[in-house]
């Protein structure tokens, strides 16, 4: 009963809380930051030596440093190894019920290397459920059947189920036909799945008719969005959720907004011209685990300052992938220059006959390219060479490679940089 009340309180509080200006939002953030940072210095040994409650006094952590300090960044002193052991055992059983010291333990996909580990207490799960419902449901009065296709489920998602909301987790590890059948049987009104799954379902399950469709857990490419929208007859929205928090969601106008009411976002700009940045986030509500000045590995392209929905929350034009996968080339004028994955995707997928591709950059800047269908290899090569020349970059060796073996639960990485 207590958890349901927490969920209801979070739902109502989030749904009806409106910020009339950026100033009002920033006042809310400052209040929450004061509470979070003051508690962090008291509760988490990692921050015991931090001299003040000023956010700038706290170090910026990436995944490696955060995992290295894991036992000092959770309020139970749990070690990384014991949490990993519990979570991996649960994943092998496909049960996703791992728990250590009363905290649920979940794993990230490990796209950027080592898997992240997240801990949630029952009260945090209840609050997350309320916030998610408030932001994702088009109506609070109409019944909803919510289907989520993901690599892993667990208490964090199960906490949504009940009452007027029916929830169904579908295991991404299932064969595509089985996923489609389970969704047909459930007939969701709201469907959330990785973009490649949505793309497959359009062809495989024409009888599915969700009223709302969310792309989750991977980069939504333009050509996939067009096919999915045409297939389901509704716009594809995005839900930006990571191990580190509920980071953003599309509004009714299709604009992706950062959840700045839940997380404080600092921007590490990586391209001055476009404003592309890597977010450094501080969770304003999490308690079991410290997410303070955590550098995400994503590259975000800022959106317009204003949105027709009237929200003052910052907008994102596109989530472009991992910062680690920004390609690096020698410029013809000298020096090194980045090439963002979004440009590569657009050019290669726009080449004649190309349906899909995988591109890997080696430490020596050479490229390995796999293309579907195989007969499109030459046109993909030419398109890639043309892009590099147009950007004023030295064209390295480009070699064809076999299509890589990919687990069905793995995130799709079309563009990847090694080393």
What residue spans do the PLM features occupy?
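Nucleotide 5′-phosphate-binding alpha/beta core
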Residues: 1-107, 113-127, 133-138, 152, ...
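Active-site glycine/GP-rich loop and adjacent strand/helix microenvironment
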Residues: 1-31, 35-38, 165-419
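Acidic/polar active-site rim loop that often engages polyanionic ligands
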Residues: 108-112, 162-164, 209
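Short coil/turn connectors at secondary-structure junctions
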Residues: 114, 141-144, 187-188
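Short, well-ordered, mixed-charge alpha-helical segments that flank or form enzyme active sites
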Residues: 116-117, 126-128, 153-159, 200-201, ...
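Glycine-rich, histidine-containing beta strand-loop boundary motifs that form or position
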Residues: 119-121, 148-150, 194-195, 240
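A short secondary-structure junction signal
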Residues: 119-120, 158-160, 203, 291-293
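Conserved AMP-binding loop of ANL adenylate-forming enzymes
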Residues: 133-170
